[in-house]
């Protein structure tokens, strides 16, 4: 069973006398006992037919509110419901019987035993073996801000100094603009519930992707990889060498592509996709050693072909990362 309309009415009676003062910052609450319903409040079988004794006086509001919260959190369904919501947000929006039994149930017990401490239950979920299971990787589409911020972190895009307020504002403006273009205008949700992608069944996260937003998501990464955002003499742009040099053997095409895709993508690629990426480094099927020689010259300032090799290799790396981030797998987290 579930709570009833009568339960809602009784809860409203518990809250009589309370008001909000919007003139304070932050808002404050006030209890006026003369406006409080002092009669008993009777709840349904869902709450064990609990009766909250009516109180009077200046402490009546706190006393009855505490009694109601104790009653509400004494019902197992409260912890189960909240854990399902956490699971939908952080793991996946479909909860089958197996997940309900093996994950949600035990998680709800942890939640109750912790005194309903969100930090404890989140730590348990996010450190669980289930959370890192391969089946749960790449199953949620990134929201636009996660895609943007994730890209900047992955590519270690350098931002202006924290004291340069004008440039920083222009950088945030870029993010805000692309957020609006991809249907996440921060600070201006469509309604009080927020954005449907985080709550609306059955679409949930799939709402982020459509024929209009997908090209614009790709345009964001393309722009910062290939062109950069110029404000005066400052350019915000991803340097492909920063990430590339962190790999174990970037001079070997197969190693570079394998480690780059493992780092940037949640799912493994097909042989055909890997071949397509390799074609960027070795156009026309030329031997692997061509990239190895090019990479060596590009990273050795004393090499007589350094400048030419650096320009060519940089262009190839930019196109490689562009291609990886244009894959559908990059839209997943």
Where are these regions (language model features)?
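Non-catalytic, conformational "gating/processing" segments within enzyme and secreted inhibitor domains
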Residues: 1-97
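Flexible, low-complexity segments enriched for small/polar residues
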Residues: 75, 79, 83-114, 123-333
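Alpha-helical scaffold segments in carbohydrate-active enzymes
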Residues: 10-21, 113, 117-120, 124-127, ...
């Amino acid at each position: 069973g579930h709570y009833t309309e009568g339960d809602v009415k009784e809860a409203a009676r518990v809250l009589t006398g309370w008001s909000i003062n919007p003139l304070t910052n932050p808002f404050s609450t006030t209890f006026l006992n003369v406006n409080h319903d002092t009669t008993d409040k009777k709840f349904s079988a869902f709450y064990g037919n609990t009766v909250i004794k009516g109180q009077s006086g200046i402490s009546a509001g706190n006393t009855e509110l505490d009694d109601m919260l104790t009653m509400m959190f004494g019902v197992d369904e409260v912890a189960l419901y909240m854990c399902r919501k956490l699971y939908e947000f952080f793991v996946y929006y479909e909860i089958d019987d197996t997940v309900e039994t093996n994950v949600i149930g035990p998680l709800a017990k942890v939640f109750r035993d912790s005194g309903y401490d969100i930090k404890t239950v989140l730590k348990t979920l996010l450190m669980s073996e289930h959370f890192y299971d391969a089946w749960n990787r790449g199953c949620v589409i990134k929201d636009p801000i996660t895609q943007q911020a994730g890209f900047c972190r992955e590519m270690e895009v350098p931002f202006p100094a924290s004291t340069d307020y004008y440039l920083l504002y222009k950088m945030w403006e870029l993010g805000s603009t692309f957020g609006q273009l991809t249907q996440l205008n921060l600070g201006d949700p469509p309604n009080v519930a927020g954005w449907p992608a985080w709550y609306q069944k059955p679409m949930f996260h799939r709402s982020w992707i459509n024929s209009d937003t997908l090209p614009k998501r790709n345009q964001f990464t393309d722009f910062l990889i290939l062109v950069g955002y110029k404000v005066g003499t400052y350019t915000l742009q991803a340097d492909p060498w920063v990430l590339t040099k962190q790999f174990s053997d970037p001079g070997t095409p197969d190693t570079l592509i394998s480690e780059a895709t493992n780092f940037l993508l949640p799912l493994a690629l097909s042989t055909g996709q890997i071949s397509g990426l390799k074609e960027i480094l070795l156009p026309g099927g030329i031997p692997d050693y061509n990239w190895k020689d090019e990479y060596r010259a590009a990273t050795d300032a004393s090499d007589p072909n350094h400048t030419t090799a650096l320009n060519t290799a940089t262009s190839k790396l930019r196109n490689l990362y562009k291609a990886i981030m244009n894959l559908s797998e990059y839209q997943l987290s």
